[in-house]
């Protein structure tokens, strides 16, 4: 068993976005998954991007946002709100915009794991 204290969790951030690295190969013996909690402030955007060799599952836990997708070469959008679940296969383009008035929160499960440090400007551990 592993137990990770909240004080040991790395928090990555960009303007309006915080990503809590709950479980990953840096703080766990698990080599199969990265689990994060992401907070997106009102008006903030996570730009469209992809993960070439990892699938990702997002579980919306609070608020309402807009998925920024690219399906068959066409940029599309889809409402994503608390209770919804979405799975992105390897290479699926995805992002998120918070058009709501409150913080949007989701849990992300990524396999195989990714070190998301490359995508964020700040870390509470650096």
Regions found by a protein language model. Give the residues of each.
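A short, N-terminal "cap"/entry segment at the start of jelly-roll beta-barrel domains
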Residues: 1-33, 47, 121-126
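Conserved short histidine dyad/triad with adjacent acidic residue
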Residues: 36-52
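Ligand-binding loop in jelly-roll beta-barrel domains
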Residues: 81-82, 90-116
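Short strand-connecting beta-turns/loops that link adjacent beta-strands
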Residues: 27-28, 53, 72, 101-102
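Residue-level recognition of conserved beta-strand positions in structured domain cores
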Residues: 37, 50, 61, 69-71, ...
């Amino acid at each position: 068993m592993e137990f990770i204290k909240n004080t040991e969790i790395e928090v990555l951030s960009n303007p309006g976005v915080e990503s809590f690295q709950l479980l990953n190969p840096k703080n766990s013996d698990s080599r199969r998954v990265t689990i994060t909690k992401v907070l997106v402030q009102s008006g903030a955007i996570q730009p469209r991007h992809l993960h070439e060799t990892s699938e990702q599952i997002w579980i919306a836990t609070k608020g309402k946002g807009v998925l920024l997708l690219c399906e068959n070469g066409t940029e599309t959008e889809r409402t994503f709100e608390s209770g919804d679940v979405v799975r992105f296969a390897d290479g699926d383009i995805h992002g998120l915009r918070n058009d709501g008035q409150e913080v949007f929160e989701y849990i992300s499960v990524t396999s195989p794991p990714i070190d998301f440090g490359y995508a964020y400007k700040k870390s509470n551990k650096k």
